[in-house]
Amino acid sequence: MNKKLLSRLAPGLFAVVLFTACRPAATVKGNLDVIPQPQEIVLARDTTPFIIDRSTTIVYPATNEKMHRTADFLATFIKEMTGTEVRVSDKEKSSNAIILAVDSTMGHPEGYKLQITPEKVLLTGGSEAGVFYGIQTIHKALPILKDGKVAAALPARSEE
């Protein structure tokens, strides 16, 4: 009877062990207390952080080669800081995405707005340079992990 019970439980137990071994054991949240201070910081209602993992995608505007290079630059930063490889794409994605966008009506071409929710990060710059400066803020906020065994997270908030 014990062998029969063990043979039924073994596949399920193996699946649980395999699933938990492939996921980061913990999450380390970075902090957005950066210098220079943003003009405005709005704390999010939901304090759940945005978690960066292997399924995270950096999305850039299609046909914008400068933004493609900027997205690759951010992916390299994330890999160096956290050990996690993220994808880069020009295809829209609404969840687990870092979305880079340009809005020339923002007023200042080197300004940017950074909105972080548990589902996505939206970085909008007044120009490609503004997006680049916003990436510097993300870079400063990322925890240094390097091994990929601990997930990196960004606190939920909005900055301008």
What label would you give each PLM region?
Residues 22-159:
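Acidic, contiguous N-terminal accessory segments
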Residues 1-31:
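Bacterial Sec-dependent N-terminal signal peptides
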